[in-house]
């Protein structure tokens, strides 16, 4: 091979290695940022396709806070509570201030790391609310200037015009 072809081949190989490394690092970063969503039943029994999360895996779990399950530590901000859907209960441990809408019997989504088969150490807890929720300040302002909206059952279910 003449020197010109060697130089061109070296340049092509360097570009190929660089692009491959970049794509590999991007896929690795995307995989690290991916949190799979589970319900308590799916977490304990596995998803329909048979996959179960491994201990140490980052995930999100959603369900209802079980009444009477909230336990607060008197010396710190740590709170533990149980989340359930229609099946088994999963314990969520959270060290921080819970959202204002957090209540027993309320829907939540927690993001964290699986500690064991039925325990999650959460670093974020989000409280869910229904579509009719309105912050108290906004509701008070609306009362002063607007009449409340009266929805029919069809409209609430999204089937009415």
From Swiss-Prot:
SUPFAM superfamilies: Heme chaperone CcmE. Residues 30-161 are periplasmic. It is found in: Cell inner membrane. One of its GO terms (cellular component) is plasma membrane. It comes from the Bacteria. The keyword Cell inner membrane applies. GO terms for biological process: cytochrome complex assembly. It is a single-pass type II membrane protein. The chain crosses the membrane at residues 9-29. Keywords: Cell inner membrane, Cell membrane, Cytochrome c-type biogenesis, Heme, Iron, Membrane, Metal-binding, Signal-anchor, Transmembrane, Transmembrane helix. Residues 142-161 are annotated as: Disordered. Residues 1-8 are cytoplasmic. Heme binds at residues 129, 133. GO terms for molecular function: heme binding; metal ion binding. The keyword Membrane applies. Residues 151-161 have a biased composition (Polar residues). NCBIfam families: PRK13165.1 (NF009638), PRK13254.1-1 (NF009727), PRK13254.1-3 (NF009729), PRK13254.1-5 (NF009731). Belongs to the CcmE/CycJ family. Heme chaperone required for the biogenesis of c-type cytochromes. Transiently binds heme delivered by CcmC and transfers the heme to apo-cytochromes in a process facilitated by CcmF and CcmH. This is Cytochrome c-type biogenesis protein CcmE. The lineage of its organism: Bacteria, Pseudomonadati, Pseudomonadota, Gammaproteobacteria, Vibrionales.
């Amino acid at each position: 091979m003449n020197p010109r072809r060697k130089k061109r081949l070296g340049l092509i190989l360097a570009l190929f290695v660089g692009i491959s490394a970049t794509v590999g690092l991007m896929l690795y970063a995307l995989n690290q940022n991916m949190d799979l969503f589970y319900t308590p039943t799916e977490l304990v029994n596995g998803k329909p396709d048979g996959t179960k999360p491994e201990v140490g895996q980052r995930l999100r779990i959603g369900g209802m806070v079980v009444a009477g399950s909230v336990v607060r530590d008197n010396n710190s901000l740590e709170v533990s509570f149980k989340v359930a859907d229609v099946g088994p209960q999963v314990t969520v441990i959270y060290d921080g201030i819970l959202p204002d809408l957090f209540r027993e019997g309320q829907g939540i989504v927690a993001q964290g790391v699986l500690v064991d088969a039925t325990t999650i150490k959460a670093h974020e807890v989000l409280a869910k609310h229904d579509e009719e929720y309105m912050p108290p300040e906004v509701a008070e302002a609306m009362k002063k200037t607007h009449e409340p909206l009266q929805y029919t059952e069809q409209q609430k279910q999204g089937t009415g015009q």
